[in-house]
Amino acid sequence: MTAAVTPTPRLAHGGRLDAARRRFPDAPTPWIDLSTGVNPQPYPAPDWPITALTRLPDDDAFATLEMAARLAYRAPSEIQVVCGAGVQAFIQLLPHVFPARRVAILGFSYAEYAASWRNAGAEVMTVETLDELVDADVAVIVNPNNPDGRLASAQELTALARRMAQRGGLLAIDESFMDFTPQHSVVDLTAQAGVIVLRSFGKAY
């Protein structure tokens, strides 16, 4: 006996120049892609040995990566660093690691947080002020914000984290673009319970 399998819809994301070229075949070239935050001029890759591509990373390789992230982001020694396949992967995992009934997102912002928590059955609210985040089980702020660069101060986020902790809530701070203004990072806030900070190698490197 067999059962039909419904395929999971492909995640819509930026950077689909192939689709844009098909839709607008007469557009001038080269295209300037503003739909994704990936650096179009990355640092030159070193001459890696081919053996680096023939096996999965072992524990030592993960430890090296975590140490590199800790040093790059000035993460305190007492906090846990978790590496993954990009911030997008964590966005999709968060609703399952931190189930929530009500999620508040400081908007207008990156839409994948709302989509992921809605898919997990949460009520998602887009709010306009930091004060409105406090009433939710999970509060999400992209800082600096994508796409407009809005930036909440360390003082504001510290106060918000304290208020969320008093309610037993989770504050998720997405610092994917913080490499461009690193002095505003609040990665040290993760030393307290109920705060996670997401960082991205791909935006700057």
Please provide the spans of the model-predicted regions.
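Conserved core of the PLP fold type I
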Residues: L53-A165, A172, F177-G202
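Active-site pre-Tyr helix/loop in NAD(P)-dependent dehydrogenases
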Residues: G37, F201-A204
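Conserved A-loop
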Residues: Q41, F180, Y205
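Residue-level marker for buried hydrophobic side chains located in beta-strands
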Residues: L34, L171-A172
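N-terminal "arm"/small-domain region of PLP-dependent enzymes with the aminotransferase-like
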Residues: M1-A61, A68
